[in-house]
Amino acid sequence: MADKKVEKILLLNVHSAMNVGDDALLRSALRQLRVNFPESNITLSVNDPASYTGAERGLASIHAWVHPIDAGGRASWKFGRLLWLMPASLIPVLSQRWFKRPFFWLTPGELRPILEEYLAADLVAGTPGGYLYSSGSGLSLWTVMY
């Protein structure tokens, strides 16, 4: 069986370009991906999409939907969205798997672009850092793992 060419990469756990450490980890991950997959298109799943101005396409992450950052730079949990996350994301994923096309009937418009990227990606990778030390009493880790 021939190896499938990696054309589309989705890079997860990109927090904010405003944080120097996060930005350095992102640059390192992008450099490694470009070396290993030079022909690929890379899309970023960003928790603070307004802060990212790089060449790669940046989309609001699932985490950004359940824990958005307001204009003042403060983030707050949207618990209703957190409860809605499971059906809103599982229906498109399972319908893609079973019927070869995603059904977005219950998916809010803000989530659809990132879910479409997940489904279209040949490779999904995560940037290092932030998984264990983020705030949210474990909710951040749960949404990243989901």
Which sequence ranges carry the predicted segments?
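Aromatic- and Gly/Pro-rich donor/ligand-binding loops
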Residues: A2-Y146
